[in-house]
């Protein structure tokens, strides 16, 4: 967050870059507002865009594009997002409720930045690192959707199931199309040069596209 106030760093970006990616400001744990979510009349999540807006506004003022990073990442979601009444001490919500929350969250985030800063956020990493390695996935699943990360359960998998990735892309594509925006949608991961992981990502991409979604 402090890089937003580092004049030397910002001057470097203006001189040498045409696109920036937020380290933290656009991740769910920076955007989701627990108190507002608990008080929402429709039960859907609410956001606080203040930190992210500062970064995107600076990019807009200086003619830089922004890569949105990231909408869905099991490693950086606030735990209470998955629980009844947005309270981590209460039971996990049902698949139906979690899908509603996921759709609302993705729709709100993409819409906010496109309407407030038209054309600045030119793409989104919709889902990050969903393909597991080693024993972190069901071996019968050719997509190798992550069930755990370093021994910790993937709560998206626990609440929605292995198709949470496809639904995330579906909701993102529907939002972009409704806005009439030129925003590209990406799946992001690491170690993609390993054959096993590469093949799983290819299988996942095909599954996403079979959901009538064009993942770039």
Language model region names:
Residues 186, 191-216:
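Substrate-binding cleft/loops of secretory-pathway carbohydrate-active enzymes
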